[in-house]
Amino acid sequence: HNWFWLIPLDERRTSVGVVMDIADFRAAKVTPEAALDEAFAAAPIMRTRMAAAKRITEVYAIGDYSYRNTRMHGPRWLLAGDAAGFIDPIFSTGVFLALHSAEQAAATLDFALRHPLLGRIRMASYARNLNRQMNRYLRFATAWYTDEFVDVFTAAKPLFRIPQAVNSVLGGNIHPNFSVWWRLQLFYLVLWVQKRHALVPRLEELKAEAAPAPSGVT
């Protein structure tokens, strides 16, 4: 499940790249430039958009850029935003987590300054909450790269309003009510089952059915 980014840098330059499974990249045994060109060729929209583009820098590859600090706080310091961790940007949660954690960090530091004896406890609570939030978004991002996630999330007839629950959390609902929470748990259960037994049509099967028959075959 490759995905592309196109980020305008100015009126004439745009950062363009593709995120792909590292196993696929290694198996292809090609240069980063060749891998990027092959990804463009396999995606009609990107192939069209990049047809007249001029490459002005070298193409390079970088491995897993998600990270998490093992320690979020200490005497007279607290981590927030990208200093605390960074999650795969597929769902664009980075800015949200950075701003939200900054707000929570400010509140935590304010409390610690006003209540020095309880500051360490409040900082530990902050770290637990931030880790919990990053875990939730990392779980979504990891699931995205599986066939079953795409099957379930894009099903023509969504099961139990699961996509709405997922979108609610991806949209910033970090304290979901029970109605959303149980659908999220069901979502992961459905993914587990979908991997083994098709509850909804598999995308690869739908693609095969929609593909035109070879010439001369009826």
Locations of regions flagged by a protein language model:
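A short, hydrophobic, proline-anchored segment that marks a local hinge/packing element in signaling
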Residues: 7-11
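Short, well-ordered beta-strand elements
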Residues: 14-21
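C-terminal helical "tail/cap" subdomain of flavin- and related membrane-associated enzymes
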Residues: 107-218
